[in-house]
Amino acid sequence: MPKETGRKLIAQNKRARHDYDILDTYEAGLVLMGTEVKALRAGRASLVDGFAQIADGEIWLHNVHIPEYTEGTWTNHAPRRRRKLLLHRAEIEKLIGKTREGGLTVVPLSLYFKDGRAKVEIALARGRKNYDKRHALAERDAAREMSRIMGRQAKGRV
C-alpha cells in the first residue's frame, strides 16, 4: 500500500471560532486505538463539545466523539473516551502557564491525517461574550458588503 502524503481533513470545529477568540494554535498527535483510526479513516468524528485538559503534565482531549467502528467486534473503543495529546514538553509547559493565568482554555479546531498520522489542531482561546459574538458578526457582514461593492466598482457595474 502506498504511503499517504499531504493532509486529509476529517472534522472541523466551526463553533470554536465563533465562541472563542483564538490566540495561538498548535498541532498535536493523538494516541488512538486501532478501531478509532479505522473510524477516522471512514471520515466520522465530531469535535463540537471537545476541550483539552491538563493533568499531571500531560494534555488530554475530552468529549471528542469518534463513533464505534461498524466492522469492529469486542475490541471497539468507547466513543467519548479521553485521548492523550502528543506535544513537545516546551509546548505543554507554555500551555500550562497560559491556562493557569485564568480565562484561557484549550479547544480542538480540526482533526486530520497528515502523512498517514492522525493529528488535531488545538488552540489556546479566550471565551467570547454574546455581545462580542454579535460585534464580530456585524464586522464580518460589513467587510463582505464592502468587498462586494468594491468588486462591482472595479467591474464598472455601480
UniProtKB/Swiss-Prot annotation:
SUPFAM superfamilies: Small protein B (SmpB) (SSF74982)
Compartments it resides in: Cytoplasm
Alphabetical keyword list: Cytoplasm, RNA-binding
GO terms of molecular function: RNA binding
Tagged with keyword Transmembrane: no
Family annotation (Gene3D superfamilies): 2.40.280.10
Protein origin, superkingdom: Bacteria
UniProt xrefs under InterPro entries: SmpB, SsrA-bd_prot, SsrA-bd_prot_CS
Gene Ontology cellular component annotations, sorted alphabetically: cytosol
Primary subcellular site in the record, as a coarse category: cytoplasm
Gene Ontology BP, a term: trans-translation
Family per similarity comment: Belongs to the SmpB family.
Role, per record: Required for rescue of stalled ribosomes mediated by trans-translation. Binds to transfer-messenger RNA (tmRNA), required for stable association of tmRNA with ribosomes. tmRNA and SmpB together mimic tRNA shape, replacing the anticodon stem-loop with SmpB. tmRNA is encoded by the ssrA gene; the 2 termini fold to resemble tRNA(Ala) and it encodes a 'tag peptide', a short internal open reading frame. During trans-translation Ala-aminoacylated tmRNA acts like a tRNA, entering the A-site of stalled ribosomes, displacing the stalled mRNA.
Protein name as annotated: SsrA-binding protein
Gene, per the UniProt record: smpB
